[in-house]
């Protein structure tokens, strides 16, 4: 159904790209009409059908009514704020806690500049950026799990 362009292996530009490992995605099916008319509507309708099916089969119930006079002992944020909450909870100085929170996105912005991204997009060929990502993920998981524990066990997760 799609129109494919056959590669000309006698083309010196294509040979140079293939020698550098950059020509693998140069030829292929065009996005119009193959993807935009046939594949995308199926994916969109499938996503809508899954959402409607989940809403019908498992509706979310409304919880208990809020009581303003009964405050819980420890209020926890939503799960995606657990690492930041753990940083604020363990650092004694508020200014240092805010600076640590600001340093997280600043550090994430520097990751693409650690190695030459234009040369390779394969993560196995960029070991420094991959290592920074894996260590950052491990630290975020460690802080997130620690935020759910009491303060005396939060940094060691009760393991040591």
UniProtKB/Swiss-Prot annotation:
The keyword Transmembrane helix applies. Pfam families: Cytochrom_B_C (PF00032). HAMAP family: Cytb6_f_subIV. Belongs to the cytochrome b family. PetD subfamily. Component of the cytochrome b6-f complex, which mediates electron transfer between photosystem II (PSII) and photosystem I (PSI), cyclic electron flow around PSI, and state transitions. Keywords: Chloroplast, Electron transport, Membrane, Photosynthesis, Plastid, Thylakoid, Transmembrane, Transmembrane helix, Transport. The chain crosses the membrane at residues 36-56, 95-115, 131-151. It is found in: Plastid, Chloroplast thylakoid membrane. GO terms for cellular component: chloroplast thylakoid membrane. GO terms for molecular function: electron transporter, transferring electrons within cytochrome b6/f complex of photosystem II activity; electron transporter, transferring electrons within the cyclic electron transport pathway of photosynthesis activity; oxidoreductase activity. This is Cytochrome b6-f complex subunit 4. It is a multi-pass membrane protein. It comes from the Eukaryota. Its main location: plastid. NCBIfam families: cytb6_f_IV (TIGR01156). The keyword Thylakoid applies. One of its GO terms (biological process) is photosynthetic electron transport chain. The 4 large subunits of the cytochrome b6-f complex are cytochrome b6, subunit IV (17 kDa polypeptide, petD), cytochrome f and the Rieske protein, while the 4 small subunits are petG, petL, petM and petN. The complex functions as a dimer.
